[in-house]
Amino acid sequence: PRPAALSGTVDGAGRLAAQGGVTVNSADEAVAAVRSAHDNGFRAIKFYTSMHPDWLRAGVAEAHRLGMHVHGHVPATLRASDAIDIGYDEITHINFIAMQAMPDSVVNVSNGFARFEGPGRYARTLNLDAPPISTLVARMASEGIVSDPTLVAFEGILNAEAGQMSPAYAAFSGTLPPQT
């Protein structure tokens, strides 16, 4: 895979839409947003979690038609394997990989805290060597699908014990004022 340094962002319009991205209300608008990003020199497009699956399909198809790298969050009602079926070249953030094994009550929730809290609650008990995670990882490897796990953003959610400081910060606990 070739990393894409320049990426536009697209999300479905609404109160939970990604800040700083282009928001869309239809498949046609998703296609137009991808074309605009391409025309402005972006080599990749990142989709966010508020995208309707039909809009996502249209945007991904257009991005690939234009030779763009497709990556991003996995929208509500979809799992990582669904995003790959639609055409993602990369899954961004480890919580969306973990989403493959989450219950529907987590997967079907729109963008928001539940998409973080769910993996925080359930990922600790996932067997990474068993389906559905092992199947997903094998598929990603065979198809050249990559992940940008951004572990630093999720380590505290996925590893911390209730009432204890995240291991990543414990070494620094005495070096900063308590209010930080």
Model region roles, listed by residue range:
Residues L56-G67, A141:
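Surface-exposed amphipathic alpha-helices with a cationic face
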Residues A30, L56, I133:
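Aromatic/hydrophobic pocket-lining residues that form the small-molecule binding cavity
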Residues V34, V60, A80-S81, V137:
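Generic hydrophobic/aromatic pocket-lining and core-packing "Φ" positions
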Residues P3, G41, A63, G72, ...:
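Divalent metal-coordination and catalytic microenvironments
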Residues R79-M102:
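Structural recognition of alpha->loop->beta junctions
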Residues G14-E29:
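Active-site mouth loops of central-metabolism enzymes
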Residues A5, A33-M51, I97-T180:
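Active-site neighborhoods of metal-dependent hydrolases
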Residues R65-G67, D85-I91, G144:
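Glycine-enriched alpha-helix->loop->beta-strand junction motifs that scaffold or abut catalytic
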